A protein has these predicted regions:
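Structured, active/binding-site neighborhoods that engage oxygen-rich ligands
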Residues: 1-261
Length: 261
């Protein structure tokens, strides 16, 4: 199925909308949110000078797309290219450089660096930024750390958007989703979640008529089959996803109840 440009834009815009609203309450308890925003919590954007910000999760997803397109373009125009994960690492490093006011490279490859609104310093995950400043990034087999924070998860969204049956198969995209997250988050529970997310995004784009629950469960089963023999955490991730589905379908649980579990 052909995918329109508006579908890609819609995915990234949806991420930007949710991220811009949610980043202000990231890592806060329900009580803390109520103290700041009232008994019903956050009900809209927390605007800065009248605007909702494009924050770090959205930035990282966009830079991942930029890096993958850069690599693909070089392959098509020059007939040579490195593995796709190398371009994800390159674009992630350039994004990290945009998050600090010093030490920016004089030569870069991501045109998004010229978009000031995509380079605002909003990343609070200093450990991830530190990892991206090191000479060697992580891979699933040789992790750079044991971080399980969600900081790098949106790289998998860029990977999922990149899927096309003429250049990659689903197995390769799922692996690339895991590898992209593993660059900065070494915990298997983190990078295996990247495989699940890349699978869901790639399938949603091409078969939007399929029920979301079916696609999510398909992604979980694919992740277990591909990684379960090597990582026991694959089954833990699968259990958490099943819990999320159960909670979402329960008429007796409010979103707040689910958040507090």
């Amino acid at each position: 199925m052909a995918v329109s440009q508006s579908s890609y834009r819609g995915c990234l815009l949806g991420l930007a909308v949710g991220d811009a609203m949610g980043y202000t309450v990231d890592n806060r308890s329900w009580q803390e949110i109520q103290e700041d925003y009232g008994p019903n919590g956050l009900l809209g954007y927390d605007l800065v000078n009248g605007y909702a910000d494009v924050t770090s999760y959205t930035q990282l997803a966009a830079f991942t797309c930029n890096g993958l397109l850069f690599g693909l373009t070089r392959g098509q125009m020059l007939g040579k290219m490195a593995p796709f994960i190398k371009y994800v690492g390159m674009s992630s490093r350039e994004w990290a450089a945009s998050q600090r006011p010093w030490g920016r490279p004089t030569r870069n490859y991501c045109w998004l660096l010229r978009k000031a609104e995509l380079c605002r310093r909003h990343c609070m995950d200093t450990r991830m930024l530190d990892t991206l400043s090191r000479p060697t990034l992580g891979i699933p087999e040789t992790p750079a750390n044991n971080y399980d924070s969600p900081g790098g998860i949106t790289t998998a969204i860029g990977v999922g958007l990149f899927f096309h049956e003429d250049r990659t198969d689903q197995h390769e995209i799922d692996l690339l989703g895991a590898e992209a997250v593993a660059l900065t988050q070494g915990s298997p529970s983190a990078f295996l979640s990247g495989a699940v997310l890349a699978h869901i995004m790639s399938r949603l784009l091409r078969q939007p008529h399929l029920p979301l629950k079916r696609l999510v469960m398909e992604a979980v089963e694919a992740m277990k089959e591909q990684f379960g023999h090597q990582y026991s955490q694959a089954f833990e991730v699968a259990t958490l996803v099943r819990h999320a589905i159960t909670y979402s379908e329960s008429p007796n649980l409010s979103p707040v109840d689910v958040m507090e579990r």
